Amino acid sequence: MPIKVGSKAPDFALKSKSAAGLADVKLSDNLGKRNTVLLFFPAAFTSVCTEEMCDITAGLGQYAGLNAAVIGISVDTPFAQEAWAKQNKIGLTLASDLNKTVTKAYDVLFPNLAGVGDTSARAAFVIDKHGVVQYAEQTVTPKDLPNFAAVKATLSKLK
């Protein structure tokens, strides 16, 4: 089970790769400024994850209007994430949890997915600008998408 609503969200520093190079992505960078949506996903270059991140990219303006930053987190390398983002025109920040420390901190590890090893489960968290989890969902299977209507409804209450 993922960490619970009302819990203090674990801070993190993960790597993200873009044309500008490697950069740190930290939850604490948003604290006091805006809410954060964390979207854990199993793997780049897979059909459901691509669909999810492309849909989120198309709706980034809505999330910005709800005073929220969106960060996608997987256990892929930042270089694989960058190549996948370029190939699919994914516009949100992707952060590499290669060592699975953040995935474990949020308790969303999916053990031995399809026989290829441990990955992040598909999960969504809304964290308010004070660092408190306001929404937490882990999908039953990696094929299922989070309830994005509930994510947006939570954000609209926090604006």
Language model segments and positions:
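Chalcogenol-based redox active-site neighborhoods
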Residues: M1-K159
